[in-house]
Amino acid sequence: DKLCGVVKAMRMRILELGGEVRFGTRMTSVLHSNGHVTAVRYIDAQGEQELPAESVILAIGHSARDTFEALHSAGVPMEPKPFSMGVRIEHPQRQINENQYGPFADAPGLGAADYKLNVQLPSGGSAYTFCMCPGGYVVAAASEPGGVVTNGMSDHARDGENANAALLVTLNPADFPDSSPLGGMYW
C-alpha cells in the first residue's frame, strides 16, 4: 500500500535529475555503431520513433522475453545465468505467530511473525524461502497472455489472515536443456 508513493517519488527524482519517463512506450531495439550505443528505437502512440542516446539503462523487470530476444538478435553479448524457480506457499498467520512466538503469540506490539528457511543441497544448489509476506496475500502477477505467475504482498499493517512465501530452488545453466544464453528463459 506504500509502493505507489515510492514509485512516484522515484519517477519525480529521475525527472529532477534530467531523465525522462515515457509511458505507453515499448523499446524495439538499441542501435549501435562501432560497439557504442547511438540510439534507442521505440514505438509509442505516434508510431515508431528513434531517440539518440550515448548510454542506456534497461530496467527490464521480469517476463520481458521479447526484449531479451531483440537484444540477443542484435548481437548484444549475453550469457546464461542461474535463477530460481518455485511456488507460493500459504498458511494461516496464526500458525506462524504460534510457531515463532510460542506463548507470546497474542502479545500486543509483536505484530505478524515472519520466517526464513534455507537448505544447501548435496548437488550444490539450494532450496529456500523468499519474499515472506506476513499477514499477506497471494496475488496473480502474469504479464503475458497464457502465463501463470504468482507473487505475494503484505499491506503495511501486515494484518491479513494468512502468511505466504515463495519456496524456491536454484537452477544453474547446466540444468537447462538448451545451452544458449536464453536457454533458461525458454525452459
Which residues does each predicted region cover?
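Residues forming the flavin
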Residues: D1-W187
